[in-house]
Amino acid sequence: MVIELSRMGTYHAQTDGENQDALCCGKSRDYFVISLSDGVSECREAKRGASIASQAITNLFLKKGSYFLEFDEEQIADFALSHILCELQQEAEHSQQPVIDYSSTVASVLVDKRKKRMLCFNLGDSIILAVGKGRCRVLCMPSDSSSGCCVTTTRLAEKMVSVKLCEIGSMESVIICSDGAWREMFLKNRLKPEVAELLSNNAYDALKDFLTGQNCFDDFSFIALDMRHELRRNSA
Protein backbone atom coordinates (compact mmCIF):
# COMPACT_ATOMS: atom_id res chain seq x y z
CA MET A 1 0.00 0.00 0.00
CA VAL A 2 1.28 3.45 -0.94
CA ILE A 3 0.58 6.46 1.28
CA GLU A 4 1.23 9.96 -0.05
CA LEU A 5 1.21 13.54 1.15
CA SER A 6 2.27 16.61 -0.82
CA ARG A 7 1.37 20.13 0.26
CA MET A 8 2.49 23.65 -0.51
CA GLY A 9 4.51 25.41 2.17
CA THR A 10 3.88 28.92 3.42
CA TYR A 11 6.62 30.43 1.20
CA HIS A 12 4.97 29.43 -2.07
CA ALA A 13 1.50 30.13 -0.66
CA GLN A 14 2.49 33.70 0.23
CA THR A 15 4.17 34.33 -3.14
CA ASP A 16 1.37 32.88 -5.29
CA GLY A 17 3.63 29.99 -6.22
CA GLU A 18 2.93 26.30 -6.60
CA ASN A 19 3.89 23.10 -4.85
CA GLN A 20 7.05 22.06 -6.68
CA ASP A 21 7.32 18.56 -5.21
CA ALA A 22 6.28 15.58 -7.34
CA LEU A 23 5.46 12.01 -6.30
CA CYS A 24 5.22 8.90 -8.43
CA CYS A 25 4.71 5.19 -7.82
CA GLY A 26 4.20 2.02 -9.78
CA LYS A 27 4.03 -1.73 -9.42
CA SER A 28 4.41 -4.82 -11.57
CA ARG A 29 4.32 -8.53 -10.87
CA ASP A 30 7.78 -8.45 -9.32
CA TYR A 31 8.44 -4.84 -8.32
CA PHE A 32 7.26 -1.84 -6.36
CA VAL A 33 8.70 1.62 -7.02
CA ILE A 34 8.12 4.87 -5.15
CA SER A 35 9.76 8.16 -6.10
CA LEU A 36 9.88 11.78 -4.97
CA SER A 37 11.36 14.86 -6.64
CA ASP A 38 11.64 18.42 -5.37
CA GLY A 39 11.87 21.15 -7.99
CA VAL A 40 14.37 23.98 -7.53
CA SER A 41 12.35 27.06 -6.60
CA GLU A 42 14.47 29.45 -8.66
CA CYS A 43 13.91 27.43 -11.85
CA ARG A 44 11.13 28.41 -14.25
CA GLU A 45 9.97 24.85 -14.95
CA ALA A 46 10.70 23.39 -11.52
CA LYS A 47 7.37 21.59 -11.13
CA ARG A 48 7.51 20.11 -14.63
CA GLY A 49 11.12 19.04 -14.12
CA ALA A 50 10.27 17.34 -10.84
CA SER A 51 7.36 15.50 -12.44
CA ILE A 52 9.50 14.30 -15.35
CA ALA A 53 12.30 13.14 -13.03
CA SER A 54 10.03 11.17 -10.69
CA GLN A 55 8.14 9.55 -13.56
CA ALA A 56 11.31 8.76 -15.50
CA ILE A 57 13.06 6.92 -12.68
CA THR A 58 9.87 5.11 -11.64
CA ASN A 59 9.27 3.80 -15.15
CA LEU A 60 12.95 2.91 -15.60
CA PHE A 61 13.11 0.87 -12.39
CA LEU A 62 9.84 -0.91 -13.17
CA LYS A 63 11.00 -1.90 -16.66
CA LYS A 64 14.66 -2.64 -15.91
CA GLY A 65 14.58 -3.56 -12.23
CA SER A 66 16.30 -6.90 -12.69
CA TYR A 67 19.30 -5.20 -14.32
CA PHE A 68 19.60 -2.43 -11.75
CA LEU A 69 19.54 -4.88 -8.86
CA GLU A 70 22.64 -6.54 -10.35
CA PHE A 71 24.54 -3.32 -11.13
CA ASP A 72 27.11 -1.83 -8.80
CA GLU A 73 26.44 1.53 -7.16
CA GLU A 74 28.37 3.54 -9.74
CA GLN A 75 26.50 1.94 -12.64
CA ILE A 76 23.14 2.52 -10.96
CA ALA A 77 23.87 6.21 -10.43
CA ASP A 78 25.23 6.70 -13.95
CA PHE A 79 22.52 4.84 -15.88
CA ALA A 80 19.57 6.18 -13.88
CA LEU A 81 20.70 9.79 -13.98
CA SER A 82 21.57 9.59 -17.69
CA HIS A 83 18.03 8.38 -18.39
CA ILE A 84 16.46 11.18 -16.34
CA LEU A 85 18.65 13.82 -18.00
CA CYS A 86 17.73 12.49 -21.44
CA GLU A 87 14.04 12.89 -20.62
CA LEU A 88 14.63 16.42 -19.34
CA GLN A 89 16.64 17.38 -22.42
CA GLN A 90 13.88 16.15 -24.71
CA GLU A 91 11.34 18.27 -22.85
CA ALA A 92 13.66 21.28 -22.87
CA GLU A 93 14.22 21.00 -26.62
CA HIS A 94 10.50 20.61 -27.27
CA SER A 95 9.67 23.66 -25.14
CA GLN A 96 12.72 25.64 -26.27
CA GLN A 97 13.83 26.20 -22.68
CA PRO A 98 17.26 25.69 -21.08
CA VAL A 99 17.45 22.26 -19.47
CA ILE A 100 18.64 23.86 -16.22
CA ASP A 101 15.13 25.31 -15.85
CA TYR A 102 13.92 21.75 -15.14
CA SER A 103 16.26 21.08 -12.22
CA SER A 104 15.11 19.00 -9.26
CA THR A 105 16.23 16.51 -6.68
CA VAL A 106 15.16 12.90 -7.17
CA ALA A 107 14.88 9.95 -4.79
CA SER A 108 13.49 6.50 -5.49
CA VAL A 109 13.10 3.06 -3.93
CA LEU A 110 12.87 -0.15 -5.96
CA VAL A 111 11.56 -3.23 -4.14
CA ASP A 112 11.88 -6.76 -5.53
CA LYS A 113 8.89 -8.53 -3.98
CA ARG A 114 10.03 -12.05 -4.85
CA LYS A 115 13.70 -11.83 -3.93
CA LYS A 116 13.00 -9.42 -1.06
CA ARG A 117 15.71 -7.00 -2.07
CA MET A 118 15.70 -3.22 -2.20
CA LEU A 119 17.52 -0.48 -4.09
CA CYS A 120 17.56 3.09 -2.78
CA PHE A 121 18.60 6.02 -4.99
CA ASN A 122 18.96 9.55 -3.63
CA LEU A 123 20.21 12.70 -5.36
CA GLY A 124 19.73 15.84 -3.31
CA ASP A 125 18.33 16.63 0.10
CA SER A 126 15.53 14.10 0.53
CA ILE A 127 15.83 11.32 3.11
CA ILE A 128 14.89 7.63 2.88
CA LEU A 129 13.88 5.80 6.06
CA ALA A 130 13.02 2.18 6.80
CA VAL A 131 10.65 0.94 9.50
CA GLY A 132 10.58 -2.54 11.00
CA LYS A 133 9.97 -4.25 14.33
CA GLY A 134 9.10 -0.97 15.99
CA ARG A 135 12.30 0.79 14.95
CA CYS A 136 13.28 3.38 12.34
CA ARG A 137 16.60 3.70 10.55
CA VAL A 138 18.04 5.86 7.81
CA LEU A 139 18.76 4.14 4.50
CA CYS A 140 19.92 7.23 2.57
CA MET A 141 20.90 10.51 4.18
CA PRO A 142 20.18 13.86 2.54
CA SER A 143 23.16 15.53 0.93
CA ASP A 144 24.82 18.47 2.63
CA SER A 145 23.18 21.50 1.04
CA SER A 146 25.34 24.11 2.79
CA SER A 147 27.18 24.81 -0.47
CA GLY A 148 24.16 24.24 -2.72
CA CYS A 149 22.10 21.14 -3.33
CA CYS A 150 23.15 18.79 -6.12
CA VAL A 151 20.28 18.29 -8.59
CA THR A 152 19.49 16.47 -11.84
CA THR A 153 21.17 19.04 -14.10
CA THR A 154 24.31 19.52 -11.98
CA ARG A 155 27.53 18.66 -13.81
CA LEU A 156 28.85 15.27 -12.63
CA ALA A 157 25.77 14.81 -10.47
CA GLU A 158 26.16 11.04 -10.76
CA LYS A 159 29.17 11.34 -8.44
CA MET A 160 26.89 12.77 -5.75
CA VAL A 161 24.14 10.14 -5.88
CA SER A 162 23.67 8.03 -2.75
CA VAL A 163 22.86 4.41 -3.65
CA LYS A 164 22.08 1.57 -1.26
CA LEU A 165 21.39 -2.09 -2.11
CA CYS A 166 20.07 -4.20 0.75
CA GLU A 167 17.91 -7.11 1.81
CA ILE A 168 14.42 -6.25 3.00
CA GLY A 169 14.81 -8.50 6.03
CA SER A 170 12.61 -7.24 8.85
CA MET A 171 11.58 -4.02 7.07
CA GLU A 172 7.84 -3.41 7.10
CA SER A 173 7.73 -0.09 5.27
CA VAL A 174 9.94 2.49 3.63
CA ILE A 175 9.38 6.23 3.30
CA ILE A 176 10.92 9.03 1.21
CA CYS A 177 10.58 12.54 2.67
CA SER A 178 11.35 15.86 1.01
CA ASP A 179 13.52 18.29 2.94
CA GLY A 180 10.45 20.36 3.77
CA ALA A 181 8.95 17.32 5.52
CA TRP A 182 11.94 15.78 7.27
CA ARG A 183 13.10 19.11 8.70
CA GLU A 184 9.83 19.13 10.67
CA MET A 185 10.29 15.49 11.69
CA PHE A 186 13.83 15.78 13.09
CA LEU A 187 15.32 17.81 15.92
CA LYS A 188 19.10 17.98 16.34
CA ASN A 189 19.66 15.07 13.94
CA ARG A 190 17.20 12.79 15.73
CA LEU A 191 13.58 11.98 15.01
CA LYS A 192 11.25 13.84 17.31
CA PRO A 193 9.82 11.33 19.83
CA GLU A 194 6.26 11.75 18.58
CA VAL A 195 7.36 11.20 14.98
CA ALA A 196 9.46 8.16 15.89
CA GLU A 197 6.40 6.65 17.56
CA LEU A 198 4.22 7.26 14.50
CA LEU A 199 6.78 5.75 12.15
CA SER A 200 7.50 2.75 14.35
CA ASN A 201 3.79 1.92 14.19
CA ASN A 202 3.58 2.55 10.42
CA ALA A 203 1.01 5.25 11.24
CA TYR A 204 1.37 7.26 8.05
CA ASP A 205 -2.10 8.80 8.12
CA ALA A 206 -1.23 10.20 11.55
CA LEU A 207 2.07 11.47 10.11
CA LYS A 208 0.04 13.39 7.54
CA ASP A 209 -1.88 15.06 10.36
CA PHE A 210 1.35 15.87 12.19
CA LEU A 211 2.97 17.52 9.17
CA THR A 212 -0.08 19.51 8.09
CA GLY A 213 -0.21 20.98 11.60
CA GLN A 214 3.39 22.27 11.52
CA ASN A 215 2.96 25.42 9.38
CA CYS A 216 5.86 24.31 7.15
CA PHE A 217 7.76 27.06 5.33
CA ASP A 218 8.87 24.82 2.46
CA ASP A 219 6.69 22.48 0.40
CA PHE A 220 6.41 19.23 2.36
CA SER A 221 5.90 15.79 0.91
CA PHE A 222 6.39 12.13 1.62
CA ILE A 223 5.63 8.88 -0.12
CA ALA A 224 5.60 5.66 1.87
CA LEU A 225 5.31 2.01 0.88
CA ASP A 226 3.79 -0.31 3.48
CA MET A 227 5.06 -3.73 2.38
CA ARG A 228 3.60 -5.94 5.11
CA HIS A 229 0.59 -7.36 3.27
CA GLU A 230 2.31 -7.81 -0.09
CA LEU A 231 5.40 -9.49 1.35
CA ARG A 232 3.29 -11.88 3.43
CA ARG A 233 1.32 -12.78 0.32
CA ASN A 234 4.49 -13.46 -1.69
CA SER A 235 5.84 -15.63 1.14
CA ALA A 236 2.70 -17.78 1.27
Regions found by a protein language model. Give the residues of each.
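PP2C/PPM-type serine/threonine phosphatase catalytic domain
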Residues: 1-236
